[in-house]
Amino acid sequence: MPYYNRKEYPKQIWVSEIPEREVSLLRENLAGIKQTTFVLIKKEEAFHQLSEKRSRDIIFLSSNQSLLDLARDVDVPAIAYQKPEMDTFLHADMVVEGFEEVDMTFLQRVYERHFNIPWTILETKRCIVRELELSDLDALFSMYAEPGMTDYMEGLYEYEEELEYQKAYIENMYRFYGYGMWLVFEKKTGTLIGRAGVEHREELNGDMELGYAIRTSFQHQGYAYEVCQAIMQYAGEELQVHLLHCLIQKENALSEKLAIKLGFSYCGDREIDGVLMSDYQIEW
C-alpha cells in the first residue's frame, strides 16, 4: 500500500549571514514550533559544520552564495535570502526576498521538494490529498482497472510509458507550478480512492480546470464533493485562483450533478479532441 500521508520535517534550521531584522521575523513565524531547532551560526562555523556534517536533518538559510553552494554539494536543502542591494542573483532550492511568508509549512515544502518527498496538499475529514510519487503507479493501475473508471475519461498509458509520463509530470508540473492532478487517499484505510486537482488548459485560454475522478467502488459516498470543496478553497487561498472550469462529457450526468452541487454553472459547449464537452464555470 502507498504511503498516503508521509510527512518529513527538518530537525534543525541553520541560519547564517541573514540580517537581524529578517532573523527576528523568521523567529516570530516559527514561534511555538517544537519539532525543529533554530540555530544561528556564523559564516566560518557554517563552512566548517557543513563540510563535516552530511545530514538529512538540516535546512540551511543564507545570503552567502559560497555557503549555499556548499550546502548543495553536501545535499542539504537551502533557501537563499536575496538582499535588495545585491547585484547578482543567488541560487538555491528556493530564493526569497523576505521572510514574511516563510513559516514551518514553507520550510517543510522546500525540504520535501529537495528530497523528492510528495507534498501533502490538504486533508479533509475522511481523505488525504497529496502529490503522486512513482511508487503509486501499481495502485493507480489497480484503480483504473475497475469497471466504469474510464467511461468518461482517458485511461492510462502502458506501464512503462505511464512511468515516463509521470516522471515528467512530477518534474514539470509539481516542481515548476506547485499544483496539478493529485491523488486522493481514504484516511481510514490508506486506500487510493481517486484523483483530483487543478490544471491550466490551453483550450480554456490558460484558465484553470478542476478535475476529479473517484474509484468506482467508492462512488456515491460523498468523497468527490468533500475533496473538491477543499480543493476549491485551497485554489482560492493558496493559489489565488478564483475562476475554475469543469469540462464534462455530455453523457456524464453524475459529474454534471456534482459540478452544480459545487456551485458551477453551465456556460456552453466546447469540442475538445473531437469530444463534445459541457463547460461549467464558477467565479468567486
What are these regions (language model features)?
Residues 6-20:
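Short hydrophobic beta-strand segments
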Residues 14, 59-62:
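Structural motif
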Residues 45-47, 162-163:
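Short alpha-helical segment
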Residues 148-169, 179:
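Conserved GNAT-fold acetyl-CoA-binding loop/helix
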